[in-house]
UniProtKB/Swiss-Prot annotation:
This protein's UniProt keywords: Cytoplasm, DNA-binding, Repressor, Transcription, Transcription regulation
Region annotated GAF domain, chain positions: 1-159
Chief place where the protein resides: cytoplasm
Function: DNA-binding global transcriptional regulator which is involved in the adaptive response to starvation and acts by directly or indirectly controlling the expression of numerous genes in response to nutrient availability. During rapid exponential growth, CodY is highly active and represses genes whose products allow adaptation to nutrient depletion.
Gene that encodes the chain: codY
Location of this chain's protein in the cell: Cytoplasm
GO cellular component: cytoplasm
An individual GO BP term: negative regulation of DNA-templated transcription
Name the UniProt record assigns to this protein: Global transcriptional regulator CodY
Disulfide bonds: none
Domain of life, per lineage: Bacteria
GO molecular function, one term: GTP binding
Taxonomic lineage: Bacteria, Bacillati, Bacillota, Bacilli, Lactobacillales
Classification via CDD domains: HTH_ARSR
């Protein structure tokens, strides 16, 4: 049996994973799975708004309502608000407690069900909650030490992800600003008309038709598209007589055009 030190090392090793290695749909599934294996429980991670970031069901609970939460990737508002008022780890909560993850209809099935909730902090901010539970068997002091360490590790990873997202947003906005600054008034007019033709972020367009409608030459549209493509704002592909296929890959351009 791994001792407390070995389990602690397994948890802290999670920090060696880069943010880029996180899954897109549920970024913390692997992390929740590792925590569930180490602490021997079911586990889930939610952000401050109750959105499910990852979960692992080591033990089947057979509760349809809980599984519906996982499928919807969203916990109920009432539960999220109650969890947000937990400022320190609340351990071994019974099925009678409002913070139990066991629905009321499963109390008779799992009378010994126990839930532990640990707040997740990062950079002095509340980022979410780590929720673990068992159908029976209390979480020991060693388990709770691991829970405290786990919530800290998850908080660091969440903060890293937020930082990565912020840096990505800044990079994209800078690219948009630089691209816009290279456009003439006519080219800006052309870009606004072109993107207005798209169905969402992509679509097919015919440059000559747009040029005639807004009173500019086709070459202005071609130049505008080249500038946006070279800046990494759009991708385009010629469809021959059918026109041009266009896809926006930096959505910051839409917000910038609203200022035009």
């Amino acid at each position: 049996m791994p001792n407390l030190l070995e389990k602690t090392r397994k948890i802290t090793s999670i920090l060696q994973r880069s943010v880029d290695s996180l899954e897109t749909e549920l970024p913390y599934n692997t992390m929740a799975s590792r925590l569930a294996d180490i602490i021997d429980c079911n586990a889930c991670i939610i952000n401050g708004g109750g959105t499910l970031l990852g979960y692992a069901m080591k033990y089947k609970t057979n509760t349809d309502r809980v599984e519906e939460f996982f499928e919807a990737k969203q916990f109920p508002d009432t539960y999220v608000k109650a969890a947000s008022r937990v400022y320190d780890t609340e351990a071994n909560l019974s099925v009678e407690n409002e913070l139990t993850i066991f629905p009321v209809e499963s109390k008779d099935t799992y009378p010994g069900g126990l839930t532990t909730i640990a707040p997740i902090y990062g950079g002095g901010m509340r980022l979410g909650s780590l929720i673990i539970w068992r159908n029976d068997n209390e979480f020991s002091d060693d388990d709770l030490i691991l829970v405290e360490i786990s919530s800290t590790v998850v908080g660091i990873q969440l903060l890293n992800l937020q930082t990565e997202n912020l840096e990505d947003t800044i990079r994209k906005q800078t690219a948009v600003n630089m691209a816009i600054n290279t456009l003439s008034y006519s080219e800006m007019k052309a870009v606004a008309a072109i993107l207005g033709e798209l169905d969402g972020n992509e679509g097919r367009l015919t440059a000559s038709v747009i040029a005639d409608r807004i009173g500019i030459t086709r070459s202005v549209i071609v130049n505008a598209l080249r500038k946006l493509e070279s800046a990494g704002i759009i991708e385009s592909r010629s469809l021959g007589m059918k026109g041009t296929y266009l896809k926006v890959i930096n959505e910051g351009i839409f917000a910038k055009l609203k200022e035009f």
